[in-house]
From Swiss-Prot:
<keyword id="KW-1015">Disulfide bond</keyword>
<keyword id="KW-0134">Cell wall</keyword>
<feature type="disulfide bond">
    <location>
        <begin position="40"/>
        <end position="52"/>
    </location>
</feature>
<protein>
    <recommendedName>
        <fullName>Class II hydrophobin 5</fullName>
    </recommendedName>
</protein>
<comment type="function">
    <text>Aerial growth, conidiation, and dispersal of filamentous fungi in the environment rely upon a capability of their secreting small amphipathic proteins called hydrophobins (HPBs) with low sequence identity. Class I can self-assemble into an outermost layer of rodlet bundles on aerial cell surfaces, conferring cellular hydrophobicity that supports fungal growth, development and dispersal; whereas Class II form highly ordered films at water-air interfaces through intermolecular interactions but contribute nothing to the rodlet structure.</text>
</comment>
<feature type="signal peptide">
    <location>
        <begin position="1"/>
        <end position="17"/>
    </location>
</feature>
<dbReference type="GO" id="GO:0005576">
    <property type="term" value="C:extracellular region"/>
</dbReference>
<feature type="disulfide bond">
    <location>
        <begin position="39"/>
        <end position="69"/>
    </location>
</feature>
<feature type="disulfide bond">
    <location>
        <begin position="79"/>
        <end position="90"/>
    </location>
</feature>
<dbReference type="Pfam" id="PF06766">
    <property type="entry name" value="Hydrophobin_2"/>
</dbReference>
<keyword id="KW-0732">Signal</keyword>
<keyword id="KW-0964">Secreted</keyword>
<dbReference type="InterPro" id="IPR036686">
    <property type="entry name" value="Hydrophobin_sf"/>
</dbReference>
<comment type="similarity">
    <text>Belongs to the cerato-ulmin hydrophobin family.</text>
</comment>
<feature type="disulfide bond">
    <location>
        <begin position="30"/>
        <end position="78"/>
    </location>
</feature>
<dbReference type="InterPro" id="IPR010636">
    <property type="entry name" value="Cerato-ulmin_hydrophobin"/>
</dbReference>
Amino acid sequence: MQFSLALVTLLATAVSALPTEEKRQAYIPCSGLYGTSQCCATDVLGVADLDCGNPPSTPANATDFSAVCSAIGQRARCCVLPILDQGILCNTPTGVQD
């Protein structure tokens, strides 16, 4: 009886000493219909954005997405359909301040 109590106590101590694993979700700036992340220079009434391209690096969060695009003189956008460096139907990603 005492042996089993000692064994349970030992196992409980060992389990409580194990570090917890923290899993973080990857940042996905654009999803759904507006699923293409772009850095665009000019916004035309929210219908089209001019001089758009893919972000030069993968953003880690909304602030980083804005900073990555700002570093090349553009703004972070989520577009429906980028065609020939033009973003069609673009909006500002969640968490990004214009």
